[in-house]
UniProtKB/Swiss-Prot annotation:
It catalyses: Endonucleolytic cleavage at a junction such as a reciprocal single-stranded crossover between two homologous DNA duplexes (Holliday junction). InterPro entries: RNaseH-like_sf, RNaseH_sf, X-over_junc_endoDNase_RuvC. Mg(2+) 1 binds at D7, D137. Homodimer which binds Holliday junction (HJ) DNA. The HJ becomes 2-fold symmetrical on binding to RuvC with unstacked arms; it has a different conformation from HJ DNA in complex with RuvA. In the full resolvosome a probable DNA-RuvA(4)-RuvB(12)-RuvC(2) complex forms which resolves the HJ. Its main location: cytoplasm. It is an enzyme of class 3 (hydrolase). This is Crossover junction endodeoxyribonuclease RuvC. Mg(2+) 2 binds at E66. The active site is at D7, E66, D137. The RuvA-RuvB-RuvC complex processes Holliday junction (HJ) DNA during genetic recombination and DNA repair. Endonuclease that resolves HJ intermediates. Cleaves cruciform DNA by making single-stranded nicks across the HJ at symmetrical positions within the homologous arms, yielding a 5'-phosphate and a 3'-hydroxyl group; requires a central core of homology in the junction. The consensus cleavage sequence is 5'-(A/T)TT(C/G)-3'. Cleavage occurs on the 3'-side of the TT dinucleotide at the point of strand exchange. Its cofactor is Mg(2+). Binds 2 Mg(2+) ion per subunit.
């Protein structure tokens, strides 16, 4: 099973492609897309192009994206929402099921600490995956992919089922990553 993790951002978009075979995790590819100092629309276009190329190269079966952090300023949340939209569109265009996880859930699954800092995320990526991420965006993206793999509640369908059928079966059997306990219908 190969999963793409995306840590969206308009200035730096981290990505991590992680493969799982049994209990073994392997980094297929990871890095950070840095579109440069351009107007917003052009930065988002470059991120979309980079994610499209990455998906074509790595051929993940599913994508996982970090959800918006609610404590951000309204302007930061808007910009992050636009970058998330690009990440979601790239995955949807490739036909990948997309799963979203809260930052604290990702940190808990990756480090065992839901409030882990950037240094702890980088250290865990080195220790757990043997990766050497240069930026926290890359480590976060790897963590998002690992979190998704940890949350999967089933085995991958047998070989020969085909990529599309395997992806549909995977999406149908996943547990929700969060539940709404507010009681509203």
């Amino acid at each position: 099973m190969i999963v793409l993790g995306i840590d969206p951002g308009s200035r730096r978009c981290g990505y991590g492609v992680v493969a799982r075979e049994g209990a073994r995790l392997t980094v297929v590819e990871s890095g950070v897309l840095v579109p440069g100092d351009l107007p917003m629309a052009q930065r988002l276009g470059r991120i979309l192009d980079g994610l499209d190329a990455l998906i074509a190269r790595a051929r993940p079966l599913e994508a996982s994206v970090e959800s918006v952090f609610s404590g951000a300023s309204p302007r930061s949340a808007l910009v992050l929402g636009q970058a998330r939209g690009v990440a979601l569109a790239a995955a949807a265009r490739a036909g990948l099921p997309v799963f979203e996880y809260a930052p604290s859930e990702v940190k808990l699954a990756f480090t065992g600490n839901g409030r882990a800092g950037k240094d702890q995320m980088l250290r865990t990526a080195r220790m757990l995956l043997g990766a050497a991420p240069g930026l926290s965006d890359e480590a976060d993206a790897l963590a998002i992919a690992v979190c998704h793999l940890a949350r999967r509640a089933f085995a991958v369908p047998a070989a020969g089922a085909g990529r599309a059928a395997a992806a549909r079966a995977a999406a149908a059997r996943l547990r929700p990553s969060r539940r709404d306990h507010r009681g509203t219908p």
